[in-house]
Amino acid sequence: MNINVSSNALFSETDRQDIQGFVTSSFGHLPNAAYLFLRFDRREAARRWLRELRPQITTARSWRRRADAPKETPKKTLNLAFSASGLRGLGLPDNCLESFPAEFVEGMAAPERSCDIGDTGDSAPSGWQFGNDKRPVDGVGLLCADSPESLELDRQLFARQLVEVGLGKIVVEEFGTRPRDDKEPFGFRDGMAQPSILGITKNGVRAGEFILGYENEYGYHPVSPLLGCDLDPAGLLPDSPNPHHRGERDFGRNGTFLVYRKLEQNVAGFWGFMRDEAKRLHDRTDPGSWFGSRRR
């Protein structure tokens, strides 16, 4: 149930420190990235690792010390995301996990879910390199850096910290590099979508469209995962704004959902289709402007 609450106040610095940095920035100035997918096999080790890693996580804090000060952009970043199995492995109780959306709890590899989103045939989960029943993941470390050398040092440190606490292993490593000409493989300019979020900036889309615990464009608070008050004795989490859930905490506040999809792109096939369609439509319009107006 959605609850109508009106507030467009800018985020406090405390809230910004509680929001992960990748939610509010694509870190476009950092061209090198690594995605390190993890498995947890010891709960206490996983919790200790997360406590020790927490101070290193890049938050959404302002890049300006003062309003009139220049930006101090980070030269490297670290963010984390967890799957439902990862949260369970960290000790999150089942009744809290049940308050998450079914799409998250079931995951993309679930038979009905994969069918709904078109992951069938050659794209079926059974053929995935990871993220399926054969090679599940509990979490991912997202690293960005200003140089390949810096990224490699950060990757080694991340892996070493896992070993030091006796925690699981890195299942798979994926790497990405932003092209110097800012063009993706199809030849189009790759401007990572990054809408302005109201509360982070003075104008933009309401925060609830991207961040849990806030008002969305419809003027409501979307449903957020819940945690019983008895599991938050220190009162670290705010109360749920939903009157039907009095006595429960808003576990999702300042969090969001992340989707990682690995796709194979057929560049030659795409442009072959474009040429064929251009010939078919040649008598109707200028094919170059009709199909390629956004290609740079």
Task: List the model feature ranges, each with a label.
Residues 1-296:
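Long, low-complexity, Ser/Thr/Gly/Pro-rich intrinsically disordered segments that act as flexible linkers
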